[in-house]
């Protein structure tokens, strides 16, 4: 892969840079093996170019991509001066020793591993055998690769000085005096290395690999969770990768042309912004002019003065100051309002204006629901006749009481009721039109929202509720005493419990909204409820709940075709991965729906499937966190990582200063 080739060349130049300056100055150069084993690097291809040849710093390396684009890459400070703070003394550990931690393996069943023709059997503290099996029976001779002889002594001064076991973080045993070797006539011997593997607590101890570096001399690697409590054998915390920043290096004329394009683009952007602002001002001034209330021709000047004074009362203080004048002219205003009702004041119009900012489809759906709820209450509100003052209603009621006829109805309001009926009919017609428009808009919106968009909206709502729950938890922690939720574990348990409850509530909401989706969801559900205990339990039930398929792509052949290798179902590492996924699903209350694909890109190793480890120790340790991020935290982080990878690919394919202008590489090539 192109990115890996670029990173490998960078590291090669880095190591040469560590050696060459020392030789030129007469010093002694050395290659830090600890740096190679424990330091990680990550390359970042940036879109911002620089003028080539201007930097003469020792931490800048010039490389070229496969598209012949030159880059100036700045190495991190840790690559030049590797300083790691670590305690050379043994950490304070009061638990059992390494032999005591491994002693339960003596009573456990022997471990088996089949590789090609041979099957290897390891019995802790006793022997290692090699034989061929057919139909679960041993065929032919049984060869002993060695009998137990000794175990590594961590307290020995010579062992402390070597630091081999401490750096590699493994415990070893020596097995010797095995069967006679036909090639050299010496007895066979073997070294057994025990490594901590926290995932082995689910799948059990297993033989990871069997190597034969020298004829009839073997190395067995066994992974177990029994050694993980010991600080010397526990894997170190994975540090963040050291970033190697690479900028495209341009020639002086190319760089000046780039600066010219940037200046022109900035000017165009500023001009566009000014035009938009001018347009907004014109629209705003036009809306103000259109919104001005028209003058009435049949209103006297004294009435206009009173109304203008009344409409000028915008703040609460001005309303209180002018309340006496309003009461003084109350009767005149009431008579005039009965003859010619005044329009609603602009102050009320401004107070009734509501601004809705729609940032996502979820906000749009909520706005539609609010409009529906508001439409239901409109007819009853509109039927009430608005008055100019609160005392108007009692006055009209008193007048109506005096003027009641024999039938108990005000005779003077008969004609007004006819007019009200006509207004109500017009309002009902308007409501029906609004409801019809709203229904059509909602249907179009439902047609636009695909099922994937609905799921995304639900995930956004869930993420927002989780953030609110996080805020509630933080406020609770502040209010409680110091002994409340101090422990991080209690806090995590509370968050997980709330998240699980939230997931159940969302499922119930889905069931109430769409019964058809519920039936489809039940059909697609992969994790069934626990069946009643049967007299003959089968071991195939967990495979129906969660199935993990691990494949490997390796270029091979004259045409560099990709060879697809699939991990065997009997591989202990596959069972370990399935156990991790099942554990995350059960703890979070989630269901195994659909398919999740995770790509791990790293330099490939030569050899057959059995000779290479599918996942590194770091991949296995981080796999649980990867599943948690994808299943629990939603697709936000995944989208960010996908966008970052896309930007890296685009920046890598970009070729500056090509004859036809800027160009890009072949989009069909598999780079990352």
Curated annotation (Swiss-Prot):
What keywords would UniProt list here?
A: Disulfide bond, Endoplasmic reticulum, Glycoprotein, Lectin, Signal
State its location(s): Endoplasmic reticulum lumen
Instruction: Enumerate the Gene Ontology biological process terms.
Output: endoplasmic reticulum unfolded protein response; ERAD pathway; negative regulation of retrograde protein transport, ER to cytosol; protein retention in ER lumen; protein targeting; protein ubiquitination; response to endoplasmic reticulum stress; ubiquitin-dependent protein catabolic process
Query: Which cysteines are disulphide-bonded?
Result: 110-123, 181-216, 196-228
Q: Which GO terms describe its cellular component?
A: endoplasmic reticulum lumen; Hrd1p ubiquitin ligase complex
Signal sequence coordinates: 1-26
Q: What is its main location?
A: endoplasmic reticulum
> Which residues are reported to be glycosylated?
177
Q: Which Pfam families match?
A: PRKCSH (PF07915)
Q: Its quaternary structure?
A: Component of the HRD1 complex, which comprises at least SYNV1/HRD1, DERL1/2, FAM8A1, HERPUD1/HERP, OS9, SEL1L and UBE2J1. FAM8A1 is stabilized by interaction with SYNV1, which prevents its proteasomal degradation. OS9 and UBE2J1 recruitment to the complex may be mediated by SEL1L. Through this complex, may interact with ERLEC1 and HSPA5. Interacts (via C-terminus) with CPNE6 (via second C2 domain); this interaction occurs in a calcium-dependent manner in vitro. Interacts with CREB3.
Function as written in the Swiss-Prot or TrEMBL entry: Lectin component of the HRD1 complex, which functions in endoplasmic reticulum (ER) quality control and ER-associated degradation (ERAD). Specifically recognizes and binds improperly folded glycoproteins as well as hyperglycosylated proteins, retain them in the ER, and transfers them to the ubiquitination machinery and promote their degradation. Possible targets include TRPV4 as well as hyperglycosylated HSP90B1.
Name by which UniProt lists this protein: Protein OS-9
Species in which this protein is naturally found = Mus musculus
